[in-house]
Each structure stands twice: as C-alpha cells, then as structure tokens.
Amino acid sequence: MSQIDLLLNYSNSFYGRQFITRKAVNDSLLIKVEHFIADYFNSEKPLQQGVLTVEYLAGQLSLSANYLSDALRSLTGQSAQQHIHEKLIAKAKEYLTTSTLTVSEIAFSLGFERPQSFNKLFKNKTEMSPLEFRQAFN
C-alpha cells in the first residue's frame, strides 16, 4: 500500500468518526434541520425560492451540502435530498387530505414550477399519483 493510500484511509476513517464522536452536536443539527424545513414549508418561501434544495438548506445552516448530507445520513440513514423529499411528500399528503386545493395549486405552493414535476416525484415516492392518493384517502 502506498503512503497516499494510507493517508486516504486514515482521512476517511477520521472523517467518518467525527459523526460518531459529535453525536450531541449532530442531534442538535437534526433538530435545526427539522425546524428549518417545517418553517420553510409553512411560509411563503416555496413560492419565492422554489423547491427546497440541499444547497439552500446547507447555506442557511452555514454548512456545506456534502457535510449536511453525510451528517443526516449518519443520523437518519437518509441523505439530505431524501430527507427533504420525505418532508415535502408529507406536506403534500397533508394538503391532499386536509384541503380542497387542486394538485397544481399544491405543486405551486410547495415550490414546483411545473405540476408535472411534482406528480412525478410524488408517484416515485408513494407509487400513487397525487389524485390517486387523494381518492384513496377520501
């Protein structure tokens, strides 16, 4: 093994270990992420900023997108993108079951520029279209 390989292995193990040794800090990070995402979807920001991105979330928390994703994967088993999508789909399901908004209105309120993109993501994550979900729930 070359010295570069040894250094790379050491660096990778040190990087991974930081998520274990900083559990309290990372738990606090998860709480901040959850609050930020909830606040984002309960405000006008999706209409102004569009769909929440990992880059935007990381920037608001003064972190790099890669670090945020690695930290969330360590805590939840999901990447930052998967975590955002999970929360977005939960909010969409809430709208579909508690409001009379059309699917297009829900898509726009969540920050999508095109309802088709929302439909595709929703179906990919739930194996049902938003309309099918609404009909199954009612």
PLM feature spans:
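An amphipathic alpha-helical interaction segment
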Residues: 1-35
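Residues within the DNA-recognition helix of helix-turn-helix
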Residues: 3, 71, 88, 121
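Residues within the alpha-helical elements of helix-turn-helix
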Residues: 60, 109-110, 125
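Terminal helix-turn-helix DNA-binding modules in bacterial transcription factors
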Residues: 75-113, 135-138
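…primarily DNA-binding HTH/wHTH and HhH modules…
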Residues: 120-138
